[in-house]
Regions:
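Hydrophobic core
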Residues: 9, 13-17
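Bimodal "functional hotspot" detector
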Residues: 4-8, 20-161
Length: 161
């Protein structure tokens, strides 16, 4: 009986030491993506995915490049077209501007709004930004933290440059 108990404890110890088994995420961040099979009767088309970023928590360029690689979960999908790249980041106080490649021109207005909402929510969680502007080619969309709602009444301002 002692031998069986020792073997069981050894197995539990080994399993807890395996990556992804029993270990908590040390430096988690939440990236927001589109729910793959979103249906209109659902509350929100956006869901968060927790990711490990040990050592890079304060490196926004790294985090956004990591974000643009897309989600790990099969239940989520990137609302931005494949190949979208980070072109620039600038922050003045609580206003953050993210410039991405012009791949967003392939999206219709609602798709672009959803993509910008996901990226804005991610940025607001990573920084102290209260307003996030996403620029893609000639399109631009600004979200403020106090009026970012995930419903048909998204308070956003789209401009053409």
């Amino acid at each position: 009986m002692k031998k069986l108990l020792c073997i069981a404890l050894a197995i539990i110890l080994l399993v807890s030491l395996l990556p992804g088994c029993g270990q908590k995420i040390k430096e988690p961040v939440t990236f927001y993506y589109q729910i793959t099979n979103y249906q209109e009767n659902m509350v929100s088309p956006i869901a968060g995915e927790e990711r490990e970023v040990t050592g890079y928590r304060d490196n926004l360029k790294y985090l956004l490049t990591f974000y643009l690689m897309g989600p790990i979960s099969q239940e989520l999908s990137s609302p931005l077209p494949r190949g979208t790249q980070l072109c620039g980041i600038s922050q003045e106080g609580t206003e953050l501007t993210i410039e991405i490649s012009d791949t967003a021109s392939a999206l219709n207005d609602s798709g672009f709004s959803l993509a910008c909402a996901c990226l804005s929510m991610t940025c607001m969680g990573l920084t102290n930004a209260e307003r996030v502007t996403i620029v893609s080619g000639s399109r631009s969309l600004t979200f403020a933290s106090d009026n970012l709602l995930l419903s048909d009444t998204i308070a956003a301002k789209e401009t053409t440059q």
